[in-house]
């Protein structure tokens, strides 16, 4: 008999810095997952992506075991890092907070390609450009 997935948990955690404190501890504790085991496995798997916010999708099975998939960092956090800003604009139509080059958009789109709903790099760039526009970041061609 195959293991059944009882719960799916989606968390955004700094790569290499998972610990039992919130938000990790309470989310996994409710699903009765071995928290120290998850933290050590997650930190080992993400040690090369230091200081990036990554999304972990955790599947919890009926025997309390788990597996997890690590997705690429959110586009907004990659754009903030590329533009050297802490936050995007609250009113992106009027207030522009930064300017980045199209080459940086292309680099981010290449990194995000596996997680985006796009088949070509050109369409992935358009998705990332739209995110940048909504954050108040100007893209120079």
UniProtKB/Swiss-Prot annotation:
SUPFAM superfamilies: Ribosomal L11/L12e N-terminal domain (SSF54747), Ribosomal protein L11, C-terminal domain (SSF46906). Keywords: Methylation, Ribonucleoprotein, Ribosomal protein, RNA-binding, rRNA-binding. GO terms for cellular component: cytosolic large ribosomal subunit. One of its GO terms (molecular function) is structural constituent of ribosome. It holds the Pfam family Ribosomal_L11. CDD domains: Ribosomal_L11. One or more lysine residues are methylated. Transmembrane segments: none annotated. One of its GO terms (biological process) is translation. HAMAP family: Ribosomal_uL11 (MF_00736). Forms part of the ribosomal stalk which helps the ribosome interact with GTP-bound translation factors. Part of the ribosomal stalk of the 50S ribosomal subunit. Interacts with L10 and the large rRNA to form the base of the stalk. L10 forms an elongated spine to which L12 dimers bind in a sequential fashion forming a multimeric L10(L12)X complex. Belongs to the universal ribosomal protein uL11 family. This is Large ribosomal subunit protein uL11. It comes from Phytoplasma mali (strain AT). The gene is rplK.
């Amino acid at each position: 008999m195959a293991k059944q997935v009882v719960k799916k948990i989606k968390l955004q955690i700094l790569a290499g810095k998972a610990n039992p404190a919130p938000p990790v501890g309470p989310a996994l504790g409710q699903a009765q997952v071995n928290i120290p085991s998850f933290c050590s496995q997650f930190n080992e798997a993400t040690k090369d992506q230091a200081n990036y916010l990554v999304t972990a999708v955790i599947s919890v099975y009926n025997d309390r075991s788990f597996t997890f998939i690590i997705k690429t960092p959110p586009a907004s956090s990659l754009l903030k890092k590329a533009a050297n800003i802490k936050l995007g604009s609250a009113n992106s139509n009027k207030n522009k907070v930064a300017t980045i080059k199209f080459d940086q958009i292309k680099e981010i789109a290449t990194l995000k390609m596996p997680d985006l709903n796009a088949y070509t790099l050109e369409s992935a760039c358009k998705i990332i450009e739209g995110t940048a526009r909504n954050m108040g970041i100007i893209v120079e061609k």
